[in-house]
């Protein structure tokens, strides 16, 4: 997020492609392209908001967000608190983990989750898929008593 430049974006009919030059899961700096599709509900659509941000900010080159990783962490704390959550429980890492967990709950297969999170092995992404499925995927649910 903090290292995305305007030239890393490619808007296409389906949404936006973002070239990530380097990330925690790509230490060698090979880079990877991620896609954000348009959401049905515009009020939740990150592509719509990104376009609006670029329009308002008049950014045409360089960083799309002039922000540091520490500032992102502070924003996460601020807005989780404003939303009524315990901000101490939230970070960039917990949001990534939450994405993997919610995706799994909605039936997204591990490979697809891995393509978004950048994990190289199923074992690593499984660490992110938290215990949320303990009841959903419980064998006792199959026993009708």
In which residue ranges do the predicted regions lie?
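Residue-level marker of structural boundaries
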Residues: 10, 25, 59, 81, ...
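Major-groove DNA-contacting interfaces characterized by cationic-aromatic clusters
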Residues: 31-81
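Catalytic-site neighborhood detector that most strongly recognizes the C-terminal catalytic loop/helix
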Residues: 117-142
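Conserved tyrosine-mediated DNA breakage-rejoining catalytic core shared by Y-recombinases
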Residues: 2-44, 52
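Short, basic (Lys/Arg/His-rich) helix/loop patches that form interaction surfaces
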Residues: 56-62, 73-115, 122
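Intrinsically disordered, low-complexity regions enriched in proline, serine, glycine
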Residues: 29, 112, 137-138
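Mobile genetic element proteins and their domesticated derivatives, centered on retroelements
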Residues: 1, 20, 50, 76, ...
């Amino acid at each position: 997020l903090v290292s995305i430049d305007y030239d890393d974006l490619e808007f296409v009919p389906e949404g936006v492609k973002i070239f990530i030059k380097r990330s925690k899961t790509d230490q060698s700096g090979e880079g990877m392209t991620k896609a954000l599709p348009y959401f049905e509900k515009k009020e939740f659509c990150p592509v719509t908001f990104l376009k609006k941000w670029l329009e308002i900010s008049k950014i045409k080159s360089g960083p799309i967000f002039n922000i540091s990783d520490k500032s992102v962490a502070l924003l996460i704390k601020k807005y989780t608190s404003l939303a009524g959550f315990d901000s101490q429980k939230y970070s960039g890492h917990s949001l990534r983990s939450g994405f993997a967990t919610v995706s799994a709950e909605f039936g997204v297969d591990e490979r697809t989750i891995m393509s978004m999170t950048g994990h190289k092995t199923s074992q690593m992404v499984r660490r992110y898929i938290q215990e949320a499925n303990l009841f959903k995927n419980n064998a006792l649910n199959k026993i009708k008593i």
